[in-house]
């Protein structure tokens, strides 16, 4: 028997690290995250594997604009884990809202300055500062790999986390 739940993995809003994914990178990550593990605190250990993503979708919220003035979109993941005695407490913590926040481990080809378009670090602009009213952040472009999603205490992306318990058996 399996337990399923959905996640907001990442979005195109500026995060706590002053970075944001572009929509194309989120779309690519959607394909790359299928089959990836859910672990804890980005600790890459087979012992920590608790869940696995079996499906993703890019969700667009046309009614909400990001700091950059673009329609908000996010990568929604669907994950499963086995209903075992060892996972009983984790499932209870997910259902109770204790284990809620998540973060993703991934790679992108480029991080571009939102002010001038140069590779981040090759210009004088600093992430988190405003220039003529525009917030400087790193635009994360051209996703190349997805490693895992992790349950964490404080995610870089404030809205990332378990969305709701999905329940019984998924169509894998």
Task: Tell where the protein language model's regions lie, with residue ranges.
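Signature of dsDNA virion morphogenesis modules
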Residues: 1-172
């Amino acid at each position: 028997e399996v337990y399923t739940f959905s996640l907001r993995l990442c979005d195109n809003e500026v995060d706590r690290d002053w970075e944001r994914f572009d929509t194309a990178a989120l779309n690519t990550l959607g394909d790359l995250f299928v089959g990836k593990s859910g672990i804890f605190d980005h600790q890459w250990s087979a012992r920590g594997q608790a869940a696995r993503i079996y499906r993703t979708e890019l969700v667009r919220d046309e009614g909400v604009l990001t700091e950059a003035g673009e329609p908000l979109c996010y990568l929604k993941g669907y994950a499963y884990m086995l209903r075992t005695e060892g996972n009983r407490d984790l499932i209870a913590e997910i259902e109770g809202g204790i284990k809620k926040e998540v973060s993703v481990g991934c790679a992108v080809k480029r991080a571009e300055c939102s002010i001038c378009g140069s590779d981040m670090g090759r210009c004088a602009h600093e992430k988190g500062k405003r220039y003529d009213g525009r917030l400087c952040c790193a635009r994360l472009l051209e996703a190349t790999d997805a490693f895992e999603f992790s349950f964490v205490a404080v995610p870089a992306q404030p809205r990332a986390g378990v969305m709701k318990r999905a329940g019984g058996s998924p169509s894998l």
